[in-house]
Amino acid sequence: MSWLILSLLAVSFFVIYDVAGRYLATRSENPQAFAVIYNLGVALMSPLIFLFDQTIPSDITPYVIFMTVLGLVIWGLNGRFEYFAKKHTEASVFSIIIKLGPVMSFFLALIILGETFTLSKLAGVILIVTANIILLAGNLRHAKIDPKGVRYTLLLALILSVAWLFDAVNVKAWGVGVFCMFSFFAPVIMSSFFPTIKKKQLVRELKLTPWWQFLVLGFFNLIGYGFMLKALTLGEASNVMPIATSTTPFVVLIGILLLGERDSLARKIFSSILVLIAIYLMR
């Protein structure tokens, strides 16, 4: 399969993960404990990736190990700070600011990885950003903006952009399955010990959200992430990341088609069309 097909498969699984994740997050009492249970479950499911990608680690040099450790520390920080960002930021504000992550990743890939710059890539990124702004900016009128929340979310967007950049470098050496396992174990360690999580907090979260729901949620994120990593082995990060992470307009389309959410219908449809044009330009 081409990087484009893999990126589209990734975004389709991320959309389901996004919708399901929003539902489960409303029931969480302790997002730190939630993150530990969720990421541990996904890490243990990671061998499923070998069903469609049997790549094994190769050419593991000291440089690769160094880059991998840095990348996993960054993923650990992502898992740790995501809680603070969402705690202090309304969803409408968070959704807009976090989209800076793929944009920063796009430019970092061009600068650091030396990937090819084309006007079609730039136009595609601009269209995706514009679509998200059109779709979500209207919600800001009624949102309360907490400066602390904005700082945390900006930090999270920066962390994500760098983490994806390391993914593009590291996955080629480790293979998709092994690197998936590493990436989900890193937040478990960071969330478990900084600060230390208590057993009773984990038990309480499992009472609020049954274990099988964690696994279903994790399955969609795992497969989506696996497709994204595989796409990064075949295409440039500056192409893959803007498409694989353009979930918001597709989530909105699901709301229109399946949930009957018809408010601001013209704006929603227009935003979705912009994303489809962007994908065509970046194919």
What are these regions (language model features)?
Residues 43-54, 105-120, 159-177, 220-237, ...:
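Hydrophobic alpha-helical transmembrane segments in multi-pass integral membrane proteins
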Residues 1-9, 100-158, 162, 168, ...:
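Juxtamembrane helix-loop boundary signature in multi-pass membrane transporters
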